């Protein structure tokens, strides 16, 4: 079915699933549960690499946007003992994450396409933006920007496509993402997304876990 996407540019998921991948998951709780568990398991090694590569202790309030069951935010808060965290995701996802709630970690249900995001010092989006095309990704980031204080930082965590012609895992993943309507991006493409959404790119921090942290600040 990938051939359909390669030939037409139209996500295969929209052809075989009503509402595409995300519409299907939102209306099928069991499928959503399995998907969230799979993403949590896959991300364990990546999360360790992210926490090792970045100093989160400088933030007071850290928002994990589209954070699933909170595995990233939990580890980040362990590395930043003075910080509080806000886990932001759709209602059906947040309900499955109730076990991570604590005096330092609160849950907020919402839709990042509609806004109403929490006010934080740092916004984490781990493997969220690659799920969406440029138009939708820009809309998400603009909604983050609407909530973001002037001093805050935006931290996008993704596998980045290098500017070279060689084979790589991010390029292979890019084909998979095509089937659901998303894409992997180069650092320059993220910088352009940032600019279109009201952020300025500051730096790329590579980790030992196959993902990079793309940092930005409000423009």
Model-identified regions with their sequence ranges:
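Alpha-helical subdomain
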Residues: 52, 56-219
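Conserved Class I S-adenosyl-L-methionine-dependent methyltransferase catalytic core
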Residues: 1-60
């Amino acid at each position: 079915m990938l051939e359909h996407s390669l030939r037409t540019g139209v996500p295969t998921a929209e052809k075989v699933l009503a509402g595409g991948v995300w519409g299907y998951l939102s209306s099928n709780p069991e499928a959503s549960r399995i998907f969230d568990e799979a993403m949590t398991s896959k991300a364990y090694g990546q999360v360790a690499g992210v926490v090792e590569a970045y100093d989160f202790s400088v933030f007071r309030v850290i928002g994990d946007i589209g954070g699933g069951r909170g595995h990233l935010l939990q580890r980040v808060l362990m590395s930043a003992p003075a910080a509080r965290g806000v886990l932001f995701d759709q209602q059906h996802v947040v309900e499955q994450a109730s076990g991570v709630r604590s005096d330092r970690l609160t849950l907020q249900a919402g839709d990042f396409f509609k806004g109403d995001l929490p006010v934080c010092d740092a916004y984490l989006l781990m493997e969220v933006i690659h799920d969406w095309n440029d138009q939708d990704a820009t809309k998400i980031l603009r909604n983050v920007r609407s909530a973001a204080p002037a001093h805050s930082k935006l931290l996008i965590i993704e596998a980045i496509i290098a500017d070279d012609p060689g084979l790589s895992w991010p390029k292979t993943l890019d084909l998979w993402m095509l089937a659901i309507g998303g894409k992997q991006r180069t650092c320059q493409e993220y910088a352009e997304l940032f600019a279109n959404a009201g952020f300025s790119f500051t730096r790329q921090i590579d980790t030992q876990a196959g993902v990079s942290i793309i940092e930005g600040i409000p423009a």
